[in-house]
Amino acid sequence: MAEFLQIHEPGETPMPHADDNVAVGIDLGTTNSLIAIAHEGAPEILRGTDGRGMVPSVVAYLDDKVVVGADARPVLLDEPERVVASIKRLMGRGVEDLKTLGGKLPYDVDEAASEGGMVRLSIAGRSLTPVEISADILRALKNRAEEALDRNVEKAVITVPAYFDDAARAATKDAAKLAGLET
């Protein structure tokens, strides 16, 4: 179907791109994450209500809720089995890959549920993949952006390290999709 030029009287022209969604930039880091937008040609970090731009990449799974960031850190002292940090290291990794990491992981691997190659961790009675845990971090960042911008955020550009292989990149995309973000 052909699209025709729309001509309006002066002062009656609709705002261009008024219905477009905003795309955000996300640095999903191993230790900390942040979310930003481009404002007047420069990046602007979206800060939380606490004024902080950085969000620790830490997730606590409590009985009734998921807590992300600085609020999850205190749980680490009292109930470390409920907290996950540095999950990015396991993105796109299979069960066999864990053997190459050396040392013991601070998490219990759910061996029964990990069949088929995808790592599943047993955290606070839940069986979670690194993708699901990363999605919780991305969801918290998305919520921060929506509060700061007072609009829905559905699109994002997410940075990944150069060493990420195709599996880790795909896992990051899957996490974004679970969080409601199109990459």
Please give the residue ranges for each predicted region:
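N-terminal phosphate-binding loop and flanking beta/alpha elements of the actin-like ATPase fold
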Residues: M1-P56, Y61-T183
